[in-house]
Amino acid sequence: MAHDPRLSSAGTATPNPPPPPPPPPPEPSTTGTGETQAAEPSAPAQSSDSFKLKFCTVCASNQNRSMEAHLRLSTAPSPFPVISFGTGSLVRLPGPSITQPNVYNFNTTSYSQMYDELLAKDERLYRNNGLLNMLDRNRNLKWGPERFQDWVPGMPRVDHVSKGDKGALGTEGGTVDVIITCEERCWDAVVDDLMNKGAALNRPVHVFNVDIRDNHEEALVGGKAILELATRLNDAATQERKIHGAEGWENGNGEARRSFDERVPEILASWQEKWPNLPALWTLAWL
């Protein structure tokens, strides 16, 4: 305050009739301006807090385990961008007997179509075995099951936003940071397919497998565990971006990305200690 030029000028003006009233009004405005300027840099920090890794969940038919994980991630208190797939050649759902499954095509058959068909075939059977409840959940999450091998990384997915798919916001660019499969054979299929696709984007992606038995009860537990793993990974990514900046992140390089990649094995090991009944695998692959 003693160094404020307005106060010194007010001191020189003491003999004159206009006394020091002018200095007090500007004084708060000066400090107010300083506070505003100090508050502005905090805005980017808030935006970095809202950073979200993009996830992909995968099971055999994109029906039970991957969709429970899709639900958990897309409807979390702080939702994640998420897409989901199956790795099978066809979508297979239980039928009246083991030798009579209900079989559908990926990408062209909606969950609503499956629901209506099974409802018409035998409502009592498919209500009791949980298929109708599962399909009802699925059709409220996205349009229909997609096959992982048909996915082209980097191809825009804007139509999924317009369809109202849960978790679609943030995935419009057709890329993900993390893929989580729910069965080892699905993990093998994903890793093999990524190699066959040739890494056209040269973008790193962490591929995990969380081994979940294919029933509704185990899928519920597995979905909760996958959400926790996703949250731990996202917290670490956010920390590294705050420390090192986000430069190069989207291209899969930069100091923040390198530091995050190095932390992933430790994060998985810590998570596995809490979920010992869900054996996990991990590798780094490329889109």
Curated annotation (Swiss-Prot):
Keyword Hydrolase attributed: yes
Low complexity biased stretches: 29-47
InterPro entries xref list: RNA_pol_II_suA
Enzyme class label: hydrolase
GO cellular component: chromatin; mRNA cleavage and polyadenylation specificity factor complex
Gene Ontology process terms (BP): intracellular phosphate ion homeostasis; mRNA 3'-end processing; positive regulation of telomere maintenance via semi-conservative replication; regulation of pericentric heterochromatin formation; regulation of siRNA-independent facultative heterochromatin formation; sno(s)RNA transcription; termination of RNA polymerase II transcription; termination of RNA polymerase II transcription, exosome-dependent
Keyword Nucleus: yes
Catalytic activity: O-phospho-L-seryl-[protein] + H2O = L-seryl-[protein] + phosphate; O-phospho-L-threonyl-[protein] + H2O = L-threonyl-[protein] + phosphate
Residues covered by region (Disordered): 1-47
EC number: 3.1.3.16
Keywords: Hydrolase, mRNA processing, Nucleus, Protein phosphatase
Subcellular location: Nucleus
Biased composition (Pro residues): 15-28
GO molecular function annotations of the record: protein tyrosine phosphatase activity; RNA polymerase II CTD heptapeptide repeat phosphatase activity; RNA polymerase II CTD heptapeptide repeat S5 phosphatase activity
Subunit relationships: Component of the cleavage and polyadenylation factor (CPF) complex.
PANTHER family (alphabetical): RNA POLYMERASE II SUBUNIT A C-TERMINAL DOMAIN PHOSPHATASE
Family statement: Belongs to the SSU72 phosphatase family.
Function text: Component of the cleavage and polyadenylation factor (CPF) complex, which plays a key role in polyadenylation-dependent pre-mRNA 3'-end formation and cooperates with cleavage factors including the CFIA complex and NAB4/CFIB. Ssu72 is required for 3'-end formation of snoRNAs.
Protein's name according to its UniProt entry: RNA polymerase II subunit A C-terminal domain phosphatase ssu72
Organism: Aspergillus fumigatus (strain ATCC MYA-4609 / CBS 101355 / FGSC A1100 / Af293) (Neosartorya fumigata)
